């Protein structure tokens, strides 16, 4: 019986076809009709969406800040990320700003172009920058202010250029402007159009220092709180030039050639707190200080003041409602300090606030 069973098994094996070596592809073909689709073996790879603009070559990008400073660039990099909020291009060799240089930068808030070689800006270069608030163009070679600046602009700094003209039209519609810095330019009084700054209703700070202007610009906006005109060639302070500046708190006129301040000038600035008239050619203390309610700091050192009256700084009497002086400088004037009456500074409650010294 065992022999019969063994014989049948051997016969069955001998009837089978010869063994064939199969590859992986052969087994895959056999599975085609098994109800298992090939996609279950090789899942479909989803399409990769194209990447957005990458950081420009050699620049650094982080948290919407693109820093391309100190790279020797001769033009604005292309393909800047559209979500850029701050673009720093200072300390390069850019010579011109062209239309399209800032296309798609609708979210840009701050543009820094300090210390380049920019001499030309196309009229429509800043048109795409519909949210720009701060524009820094200092230390370039501009001869005029750029046209068609964004209406959203709040701060403009253009000191150390070659600007000789300030036209009223360049500031038209800039109702959000707060700060304008124009110092160290070859400006003359004739180059500033009358009322050039008047249309900027929120303007709070103007600095036109170290230029060639000989008079205080006319038609300044009443919103001003700080006016810095130090280091110019102004010879006189006219009452009319300060008319309407009711909010002015700080007036800088040091390092000029001022020999006189018209009576009534300070009355036009009723909220003035600081007056800098040091390093001029004054021969007497400006009138109106005693009647000024809020003024606290008066710098008059390095002038030609030879006498000080007992009522030059404080109103008559002791029971007066006036802010106390925190700083009065009179050193380096020909006045002899021992000739000043003791009651002259009766409204000064801190002795160290008054600085006197020998004339050199």
From Swiss-Prot:
Subcellular location: Secreted, Extracellular space, Extracellular matrix; Secreted
Glycosylated sites: 34, 212, 263, 304
GO CC, one annotated term: extracellular space
Gene3D superfamilies, A to Z: Ribonuclease Inhibitor (3.80.10.10)
Maturation propeptide residues: 17-30
Alphabetized UniProt keyword annotations: Disulfide bond, Extracellular matrix, Glycoprotein, Leucine-rich repeat, Proteoglycan, Repeat, Secreted, Signal
Signal sequence, start to end: 1-16
Protein name: Decorin
